[in-house]
Amino acid sequence: MHCPFCRHPDSRVVDSREADEGQAIRRRRSCPECGRRFTTVETAVLSVVKRSGVTEPFSREKVVKGVRRACQGRQVDNDSLNLLAQQVEDAVRASGSAEIPSNEVGLAILDPLRNLDEVAYLRFASVYKSFSSAADFEREITDMREHAETRAADKASGAETVSVD
């Protein structure tokens, strides 16, 4: 690692710690040439493979932007959107794969969005799942009602559910 101060091509790691809830490693380094210290943060790169085959780095901002569009006119704050994006990133990282298809990112968005705002969920799902008729919306609304009833029943019985849609 080059020193950012004197550009010396080597540095020594003084301390390493987990950061960002284990998603990154923060390293404190020292330059043997100038003696100054600096910090680096290392993260595993997560790439999204688009339908065209092109890969690009996963972006929480892109998730927030897409979900924000679905939430337009709804009472959803930025903190909730950022939390949703973090949940999506955690879910796709949990797959253990360095490259994830874009449709899996979309699937990872659906469940947390359903829990956040049902109208925004319907808007997002209608685009993501390519709804072409009112029947598609009706079917999705029926699924949402069943999902809500199941969650309510599980909550009443004290059971915890994990949704696998």
Curated annotation (Swiss-Prot):
Pfam families for the chain: ATP-cone (PF03477), Zn_ribbon_NrdR (PF22811)
Domain of life: Bacteria
GO biological process, one term: negative regulation of DNA-templated transcription
InterPro entries: ATP-cone_dom, NrdR-like_N, RNR_NrdR-like
Zinc finger (unnamed): 3-34
Gene Ontology MF terms: ATP binding; DNA binding; zinc ion binding
Keyword match Kinase: no
Keywords: ATP-binding, DNA-binding, Metal-binding, Nucleotide-binding, Repressor, Transcription, Transcription regulation, Zinc, Zinc-finger
Domain annotation ATP-cone: ranges: 46-136
Keyword Metal-binding: yes
Co-factor remark: Binds 1 zinc ion.
PROSITE patterns for this protein: ATP_CONE
Cofactor: Zn(2+)
UniProt record similarity statement: Belongs to the NrdR family.
Task performed by this protein: Negatively regulates transcription of bacterial ribonucleotide reductase nrd genes and operons by binding to NrdR-boxes.
Protein name as annotated: Transcriptional repressor NrdR
Name of the coding gene: nrdR
